[in-house]
């Protein structure tokens, strides 16, 4: 169970490393996309600086064995927040631009929501696996 939890943490960690690095590599594009969103325009500059750092922090939490459960909870919360934002944007501003890189850039917004929901589920599977492993070790024989 612990190995499976480590694999889940690694997959989620790689997602956060990938997204943070892509934002750092083209921060102006990321900021421009945020500025194109009426909902985020007032705080676009702050989000453009803070979000990649938050994603790196989550990746670090997922890397350190003693903080993986916290990292998984935090990742699920951040991805859920982004998914709610996407749902709002799909309904009210369907022409939202995307600064996603790699394979993710080819997803529609609806597919992106499904992708996010899969990673939220994966985070909770990881939490379950870690908690089950911890519980198992505490149970007397």
What are the roles of these predicted feature ranges?
Residues 1-141:
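Membrane-interfacial helix-loop segments of redox and metal-homeostasis proteins
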